[in-house]
């Protein structure tokens, strides 16, 4: 399995290559202007055709209908000659790259499109374009392609194809063989296959937007492979719809998001495995009702050539030479550069050992620890400050003046969900988050991914979410401090209530859990639930514990916190200040039995002198030992250390003779 570093190196090369083939902002703006202008002009052509078919109307009534055309479009769509215009191909899928910017639109007709309708739209379209913009466009008709070709006259040069089609053409083919009732086709009907291809392209665009647009790195890999199809003739037959299906299946079947380099390698692995070869699984077309192979148009030789080329590309990628597949210069390594080179021979050629660092190099600033520490700190800060901009700042730098809108706010009060949107080049992007700031950041990441810019802003989102959590915790801390002050004043000798509303754990002054520390001092305590108040999102529990005849209460948002609060109140009342010495309770270690008991008793009597009885306390008792803890050694629960106190020697220590006991063989099992 390859290391993550090698995948990161592939990601760097793929993203640099992607930045070179991605269209410039000027080209994207020109595409957006041209497509929007033609779409609006075709809408006016549709209105003009409807007015012509209905006959001459009064001027006032005509002007009113022109103004209400947009509002009544959905109602009158069934009776319109031109039902609508939709984007297909690279424009709808967002796969435009430099030197490969084929723009396509589909003009949907109510009836089967004819040459007469094509000429009518072609003649009226330039008139409507002149009303919308001052730019000059060349409009031509192509009857063989059932389309209208539109070209702009300034740089960058763009070509837009508007294909006429109708859903009646496909409905007619799907009728059963027994049905002979068919409408008579007009004599100047456009090419049926071209119209069917336009309908298929419309289905492909809808499928791509639903399945492939949401996959991470899928659009980037498709742009890289489209550039590969343009550069290498072997890959040219795979360009188009089959390539999109392969990428979606390869990347979408992974159980986790993939980076650009790893996603490209996964696609190459699928192609190199032989899925294109005869006898393989083939490539099912999901946009056709009948089982259809999307690779049926390719020859066997073409499939073998593509498989061989994919295997060679995968081999180069495995050896860290992906730059050869992308036809680019290798990028410098991201590893830190070593200052001293190690060679086998010295300058004179007589030495056989590696050169060491000269002694003079170590007499510089390294002798001063302050200067060395400052230099190391500067390196750390520089490495962390490589990219100080988050996704929102980066997008604002690329596209200034974007307007973010709040679409909705849902969820409960304690966990709201905000949905923000932004419109970029006619495309609306939406994202949600626990706050408006996070939702805007999510939207910015989506836009940057769609534009093809590298997005490594997961850390920014996590930082924002952590900041929001810290704000909430700071608010809760202020509440807890006030409540603790109030409860401290109302504490009595018989009962005490402590409420803590902090998000973090409750600890004593020694850094321990209050329940554990109180249990060490007084065993067998029982905590009782006194009350439970509040709604589902703001509960308040009160727990009570009785210690030495006194009752202490604690409150909190859950039983665990309330229990810890009650234990903390008991510790502060009974085991802190002047009451600590009186309530301190020493543990009694049970005496050993048999030979061990006799030996220990004799040793103790010998040390302490005549007339003394055996010790009733543990072997190690000192003033510095923590109450309730047994010093490690013989008789301890785990016995991982020698017979000595855990934190230094106590003032009073009994020395015991070393006792040896016979050991019995213990079976050992080995699994290696």
Swiss-Prot record:
The modification Asymmetric dimethylarginine is found at residues 612, 617. Isoform 2 is expressed in spermatocytes (at protein level). Expressed in testis, thymus, ovary, liver, kidney, heart, spleen and brain. Expressed in cortex, dentate gyrus and Purkinje cell layer and granule cells of the cerebellum. Keywords: Cytoplasm, Cytoskeleton, Developmental protein, Differentiation, DNA-binding, Methylation, Repeat, RNA-binding, Spermatogenesis. One of its GO terms (molecular function) is double-stranded RNA binding. Residues 387-453, 510-576 form the DRBM domain. Residues 477-497 have a biased composition (Low complexity). InterPro entries: dsRBD_dom (IPR014720), DZF_dom (IPR006561), DZF_dom_C (IPR049402), DZF_dom_N (IPR049401), NT_sf (IPR043519), STRBP_DSRM_1 (IPR044472). Residues 5-363 form the DZF domain. One of its GO terms (biological process) is mechanosensory behavior. Residues 349-371, 467-514 are annotated as: Disordered. The keyword Cytoplasm applies. One of its GO terms (cellular component) is nucleus. SUPFAM superfamilies: dsRNA-binding domain-like. It holds the Pfam family DZF_C. Residues 357-371, 467-476 have a biased composition (Basic and acidic residues). Involved in spermatogenesis and sperm function. Plays a role in regulation of cell growth. Binds to double-stranded DNA and RNA. Binds most efficiently to poly(I:C) RNA than to poly(dI:dC) DNA. Also binds to single-stranded poly(G) RNA. Binds non-specifically to the mRNA PRM1 3'-UTR and adenovirus VA RNA. Interacts with EIF2AK2. Associates with microtubules; it is unsure whether such interaction is direct or indirect. This is Spermatid perinuclear RNA-binding protein.
């Amino acid at each position: 399995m390859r290391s993550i570093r090698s995948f990161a190196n592939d990601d760097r090369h793929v993203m640099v290559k992607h930045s070179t083939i991605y269209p410039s902002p000027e080209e994207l703006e020109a595409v957006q202007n041209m497509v929007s202008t033609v779409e609006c002009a075709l809408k006016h052509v549709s209105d003009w055709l409807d007015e012509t078919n209905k006959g001459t109307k009064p001027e006032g009534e005509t002007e009113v209908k022109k103004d209400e055309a947009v509002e009544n479009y959905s109602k009158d769509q069934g009776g319109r000659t031109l039902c609508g215009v939709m984007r297909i191909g690279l424009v709808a899928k967002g796969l435009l790259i430099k030197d490969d910017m084929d723009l396509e639109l589909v003009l949907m007709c109510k009836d089967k499109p004819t040459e007469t309708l094509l000429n009518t739209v072609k003649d009226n379209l330039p008139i409507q374009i002149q009303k919308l913009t001052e730019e000059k466009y060349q409009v031509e008709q192509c009857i063989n392609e059932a389309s209208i070709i539109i070209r702009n006259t300034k740089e960058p040069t763009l070509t837009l194809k508007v294909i006429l089609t109708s859903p009646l053409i496909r409905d007619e083919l799907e009728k059963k063989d027994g049905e002979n009732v068919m409408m008579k086709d007009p004599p100047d009907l456009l090419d049926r296959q071209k119209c069917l291809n336009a309908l298929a392209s419309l289905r492909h665009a809808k499928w791509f937007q639903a399945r492939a647009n949401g996959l991470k790195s899928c659009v980037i890999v498709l742009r890289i492979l489209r550039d590969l199809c343009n550069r290498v003739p072997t890959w040219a037959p795979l360009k188009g719809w089959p390539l999109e299906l392969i990428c979606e299946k390869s990347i979408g079947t992974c159980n986790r998001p993939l980076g650009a380099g790893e996603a490209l390698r996964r696609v190459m692995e699928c192609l190199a495995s032989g899925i294109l070869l005869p006898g393989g699984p083939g490539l099912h077309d999901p946009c056709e009702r009948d089982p259809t192979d999307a690779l049926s148009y390719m020859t066997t030789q073409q499939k073998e050539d593509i498989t061989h080329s994919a295997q060679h590309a995968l081999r180069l990628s495995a050896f860290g030479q992906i730059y050869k597949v992308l036809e680019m210069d290798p990028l410098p390594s991201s590893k830190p550069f070593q200052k001293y080179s190690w060679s086998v021979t010295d300058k004179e050629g007589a030495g056989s050992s590696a050169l060491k660092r000269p002694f003079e190099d170590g007499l510089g600033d390294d002798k001063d620890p302050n200067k060395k520490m400052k230099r190391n700190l500067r390196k750390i800060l520089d490495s962390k400050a490589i990219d100080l901009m988050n996704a929102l700042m980066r997008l604002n730098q690329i596209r200034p003046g974007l307007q973010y809108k709040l679409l909705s706010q849902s969820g409960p009060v304690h966990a709201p969900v905000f949905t923000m949107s932004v419109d970029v080049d006619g495309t609306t992007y939406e994202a949600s988050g626990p706050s408006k700031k996070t939702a805007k950041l999510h939207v910015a990441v989506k836009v940057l991914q769609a534009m093809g810019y590298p997005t490594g802003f997961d850390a920014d989102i996590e930082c924002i979410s952590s900041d929001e959590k810290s704000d909430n915790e700071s608010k809760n801390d202020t509440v807890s401090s006030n409540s603790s002050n109030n409860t401290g004043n109302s504490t009595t000798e018989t009962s005490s209530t402590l409420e803590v509303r902090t998000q973090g754990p409750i600890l004593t002054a020694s850094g321990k859990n209050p329940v554990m520390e109180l249990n060490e001092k007084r065993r067998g305590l029982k905590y009782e639930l006194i009350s439970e108040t509040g709604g589902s999102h703001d509960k308040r529990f009160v727990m009570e514990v009785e210690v030495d005849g006194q009752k202490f209460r604690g409150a909190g948002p859950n039983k665990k916190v309330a229990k810890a609060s009650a234990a903390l109140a008991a510790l502060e009342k009974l085991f802190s200040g002047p009451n600590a010495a009186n309530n301190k309770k020493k543990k009694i270690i049970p005496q050993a039995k048999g030979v061990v008991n006799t030996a220990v008793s004799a040793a103790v009597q010998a040390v302490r002198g005549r007339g003394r009885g055996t010790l009733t306390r543990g072997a190690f008792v000192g003033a510095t030992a923590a109450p309730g803890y047994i010093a490690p050694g013989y008789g301890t629960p785990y016995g991982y250390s020698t017979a000595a106190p855990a934190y230094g020697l106590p003032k009073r220590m009994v020395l015991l003779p070393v006792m040896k006991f016979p050991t019995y063989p213990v079976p050992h099992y080995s699994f290696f």
